[in-house]
Structure formats: C-alpha cells, structure tokens
C-alpha cells in the first residue's frame, strides 16, 4: 500500500494552529532541497525555482542540496549547476546514496569547501550519452557535434571544480568511473566525508 509523501505539522509565524504540509515543503522552509530522482526538465525547474525564491528571501543563508540521483539529462543538469553558481547564497551539496553522471556534476558544483558525501555514498562520472540509434544520418552528425561541445563543457567544469588536470578528467570520462566517498574526496568532487560517531 503506497503511503505517498508523508505530512508533518507546520505552524506559520503568527498562526495559532498548525497545518499539515508534505515533508518536503516543510524542509524547503529550512532551505533543504532534494534531488532524489533522475534529472529532467521538471525537477530542474522545481529546484531552480526554489533556489531563486530562497535566495531572494535571504541571500546570506546557505542552501543545502541533498543528492541521491542516477543522473539524467545534460541540459537540465547544467541549468541546475548554473543556477547554483548564480544565486548569492552558498549552495552546500550533500551526496547520500548515489550521485552518478549529472548527479555527480551537480554535486561537484556545490560551494568549494562545502561539498560533502555520506560515508557509504557512491559517485560516478562518465561522458554524456546520446540517442544516436534514433537519429538519421544528417541528424546524427549534428548531434555528434553538439555532444562533443557538451562533453567539452562538462570536462572543463570538472577540471575547474576538482583541480585535476584536463587529461586526467578527459581520460576518466571515457568510461564509467565509480568512486567511494573517500575516493570522490581525493578526486576533488567533494571536500568532506561525513563521519559517523
């Protein structure tokens, strides 16, 4: 039996009675954002809207983006990354579970020194993929050119965010490279690994 999104009580300032809101809406009020699915236009637009709204509401208080994502579409992922760089508050990124593909790109996009992975989290980088098998020859060539541009963009951002040499990142993006939390820290995708006490 599906339970849906859990509801929690929330009382707005000045109100006597609490109302029931879904848990994510309650957490958004604490500036806690979640990417817990494949990256697509819908979740990208939701996160961008929340980051912009919360940065207008208070431009000095950090935002926290929790990531557990298998990756997804490149352009919506880059839009999230660009918004993280654009908003005034620092965006802290936290990897819980998996940050693969665009998930790891967004994870690396957090404020440097404020990117964290849980101890058993996994991170994966690779090159962007395409749907070549669906394209005809002319479209195939145009799509290949666009894919090369996107790959170059992603590679340069990883180089900038990790301080790894271009040749290392380029070589690693040739295939799926999975990392533990400590390996992702050594690579420069995250700055800290959470410690369980």
Swiss-Prot record:
It is found in: Plastid, Chloroplast stroma. Its EC number is 3.4.21.92. One of its GO terms (cellular component) is endopeptidase Clp complex. CDD domains: S14_ClpP_2. InterPro entries: ClpP, ClpP/crotonase-like_dom_sf, ClpP/TepA, ClpP_His_AS, ClpP_Ser_AS. Its main location: plastid. One of its GO terms (molecular function) is ATPase binding. GO terms for biological process: protein quality control for misfolded or incompletely synthesized proteins. SUPFAM superfamilies: ClpP/crotonase. It comes from the Eukaryota. The active site is at residues 101, 126. Keywords: Chloroplast, Hydrolase, Plastid, Protease, Serine protease. It catalyses: Hydrolysis of proteins to small peptides in the presence of ATP and magnesium. alpha-casein is the usual test substrate. In the absence of ATP, only oligopeptides shorter than five residues are hydrolyzed (such as succinyl-Leu-Tyr-|-NHMec, and Leu-Tyr-Leu-|-Tyr-Trp, in which cleavage of the -Tyr-|-Leu- and -Tyr-|-Trp bonds also occurs). It is an enzyme of class 3 (hydrolase). Component of the chloroplastic Clp protease core complex. Belongs to the peptidase S14 family. HAMAP family: ClpP (MF_00444). Cleaves peptides in various proteins in a process that requires ATP hydrolysis. Has a chymotrypsin-like activity. Plays a major role in the degradation of misfolded proteins. This is ATP-dependent Clp protease proteolytic subunit. It comes from Daucus carota (Wild carrot).
